[in-house]
Amino acid sequence: MIKKLILDPKNVSIIKNGIRNYSKSKSFIQPITTLSEEETLLKETVANFANEKVRPLVKVMDETSELNKGLLKDLFDMNLMGIDISDSYGGANMNFMGSIIAIEELAKVDPAISVIVDVQNTLVNNCINRYGSIQQREKYLSMLATNTVGSFCLSESGSGSDAFALATRAVRQSDGTFVLNGTKQWITNAKEAGVFIVMANVDPSQGYKGITAFIVESNNPGLRIGKKEDKLGIRASSTCEVILDNCVVKPTDILGELGRGYKIAIEGLNEGRIGIAAQMLGLAQGVFDSTIPYLMERKQFGKPIATFQGMQFTYADLAVDIEAGRLLTYNAARIKEAGLPFVFQASMAKLHCSRVAEKAASACISMLGGVGFTKEFPAEKFFRDSKVGQIYEGTSNIQLQTIAKEIVKNFNK
């Protein structure tokens, strides 16, 4: 059948013209990793920023577990905290792919700074941009794009992978306000945040349909920051308890609608998983790029160790894994941008890239030998930073479960 179609005289000219036009335009089918001029400029700009502004601060921020305040201001000045927020609100007015590119480039130097930008753009900004009222968008997107860190409060001590087994309650009062009580745990950006998206259960009898998202500002007297975690990695990014103690919010602080918190959180996390994939991809590329030059320079038995077959097999295998991760991540981002279902691709990208990040960091330490085990080389920090990729925004087992569900769903169509 296909042969007949190709040999049909009517189709031969169409095929020939198509090939001729393709050879002229060179743009018949663009590779997944092709970037627009604007995206390429962003990539170069963020790479330069990361090397010039972030790299000199990485060691101190890691040792002290503190984000440099001047660097945070620089992130806002560079518009990296509002990448796909409209310029009418002070944002960079780019696309979702722009956020992914920035996250990847920052992670090549410091995954901790990368995740700060990731949570801001793929979770907080996106949720308010999509579900916020006109008044909420005008107020909060302007703040988030220019000077205010955002935080996404879902997890609790008793709700990790079962993220919606929430104990935090929101009780409606006679005057229409809601009183929030509960403790959120492992909340990224909590120490620096001025705006929090808080998930609370208004009606536990309704299950996940009782969950509602509220916007709470840091100056609310009922909200305070609790214990800051002393973490293995991504130490410049704060991870804290957020304690809600008779925290009063107005009906106008509801994000979306009453009972829509589950949908808002799920959609936000699905997009956030592409962001984490980009972070882990950048980490893998960063540790790889910092290791190869040493292998070229270091000599044993009169030869650069990069020429030894055992070494070659190791770093060639890593290069394949990293490039596959880039294809998965960029493809998921492009599908999301096109408005198509992307959950399957997002989970695959996060699963693969988080695995590759740990694999790459571990392998690079082994290839570096003794120096890789010291803090003189960045590989040990990349190794510590890599582990969280398999934990937050859905563990690797949750990603496998999601992928399996999507396979079954598509098979049964």
Curated annotation (Swiss-Prot):
PANTHER family: ACYL-COA DEHYDROGENASE, SHORT_BRANCHED CHAIN SPECIFIC ACYL-COA DEHYDROGENASE, MITOCHONDRIAL. The active site is at E393 (proton acceptor). Its EC number is 1.3.8.5. Belongs to the acyl-CoA dehydrogenase family. Pathway: Lipid metabolism; mitochondrial fatty acid beta-oxidation; Amino-acid degradation; L-isoleucine degradation. This is Probable short/branched chain specific acyl-CoA dehydrogenase. GO terms for cellular component: mitochondrion. The keyword Oxidoreductase applies. Homotetramer. Keywords: FAD, Fatty acid metabolism, Flavoprotein, Lipid metabolism, Oxidoreductase. The lineage of its organism: Eukaryota, Amoebozoa, Evosea, Eumycetozoa, Dictyostelia. FAD binds at residues 152-161, 186-188, 298, 309, 366-370, 395-397. GO terms for molecular function: acyl-CoA dehydrogenase activity; flavin adenine dinucleotide binding; short-chain 2-methyl fatty acyl-CoA dehydrogenase activity. GO terms for biological process: fatty acid metabolic process; isoleucine catabolic process. It comes from Dictyostelium discoideum (Social amoeba). Its cofactor is FAD. It is an enzyme of class 1 (oxidoreductase). Substrate binds at S161, Y208, Y262, N270, E271, G272, R273. It catalyses: 2-methylbutanoyl-CoA + oxidized [electron-transfer flavoprotein] + H(+) = (2E)-2-methylbut-2-enoyl-CoA + reduced [electron-transfer flavoprotein].
